[in-house]
């Protein structure tokens, strides 16, 4: 059996919304960032020269497309990423103190 990847991760891939300042009316401004521990680890390993792949599911929506493009841009193989029209990509709102 031939090994194609050094590391393959299975798990969550989502959008983290984090505060990035305040509006003129004092409301928090939110920034959308790719998140999910499995792909964070894969991105680091990819930068260290490892060949990586991800298995998971996102919605067939703008956020899901953005996440696919993001992991592909850093070299993570996305053949195992399912884009499902019947679900929405997970959004996490991160509150910092």
Where are these regions (language model features)?
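Short pre-catalytic strand/loop immediately N-terminal to key active-site residues, enriched for Gly-Thr
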Residues: 25-35
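Short, glycine/charged-enriched secondary-structure capping and boundary segments
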Residues: 22-25, 68-70
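Short secondary-structure boundary/capping elements
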Residues: 5, 10, 33-40
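Positively charged, low-complexity intrinsically disordered leader regions
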Residues: 1-24
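Alpha-helix C-terminal capping segments
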Residues: 33, 40-51, 94-96
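Conserved N-terminal subdomain of the carbohydrate kinase-like
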Residues: 51-97
